[in-house]
Each structure stands twice: as C-alpha cells, then as structure tokens.
C-alpha cells in the first residue's frame, strides 16, 4: 500500500477528526474552568475590595444600608472640630458635595484642613459618616492618575 493511499484512507481521516474534536473539547473545558474560577474569585472578593467614593458618588443606598465603605476627598477648610482627647468632627468634600464625618481614634499627623483624606467607616441612621480609620494623604503622588484626575476635576490638589 502506498503512503498516499494510506493518508487518504477514510479510517485515518476519522481518527484525525476525533483527535481534533478531543483537543477542542479539552480547550473548551479549560476555558470553562478558568471562567468559573474567575467568577468565584470575583464573587468572593466583591465585598473585601473597597475603593473609596467621593461625597458626590455616595448613593442613598450606601447611607441606608450602613455597609462599610471608604469616603475620600479633602478635609473641608473651617470644618475641623476636635472633641475630647481623640475625637474629631469634620467634613469631607469634593467641592460638589460634602459629608459630615464623626471620628474617634488615633488621628494621623498628616491630617489637616485642605488635605486629601480617605476615611474608612459607615453611615449611621442619621446619615452621618462614622469613621473607624483615617488615612491622611500627603499629596497626589500616592494616588493613581485616575483618582487624582477625579479629584482635580472638582478641586485643585494642594501640595
């Protein structure tokens, strides 16, 4: 039997089609596993990944649900009021809207009026943001370009 007739035989074509089909099924199965793994990881991290929201991005749902979030912007000038040894009340603004923050705890050295700040906490039933941790920002050097641009849109970043 010549080699040409062997390659053109129907049984060889069937075997090659089966192998091709098997490879395709393996690739599709791997893609499915990767998609499922990505979905599970995204689902598991949806509440742990917390970027900050500026006051103008806070929704009524955020306030009503009282879930933890990060509020970012600038400490509004003229609003800082120290209460007792470790308490402070101030407003975080993006020059579109502002939110009142009530915080009790260690206040970072970089915390001051006009300075960038991210406050971790939640909204209470009265709609005040109860801070659990203050992250004072030195300047826009520590922000992503997108974040600095969002803040600069409404307020000049002070150095």
UniProtKB/Swiss-Prot annotation:
Domain of life: Bacteria
Topology in the lipid bilayer: Single-pass type II membrane protein
Annotated keywords: Cell inner membrane, Cell membrane, Cytochrome c-type biogenesis, Heme, Iron, Membrane, Metal-binding, Signal-anchor, Transmembrane, Transmembrane helix
Swiss-Prot/TrEMBL GO biological process terms: cytochrome complex assembly
Stored InterPro entries: CcmE (IPR004329), CcmE-like_sf (IPR036127), NA-bd_OB-fold (IPR012340)
GO molecular function annotation: heme binding; metal ion binding
Pfam families reported in the protein's UniProt record: CcmE
Protein name: Cytochrome c-type biogenesis protein CcmE
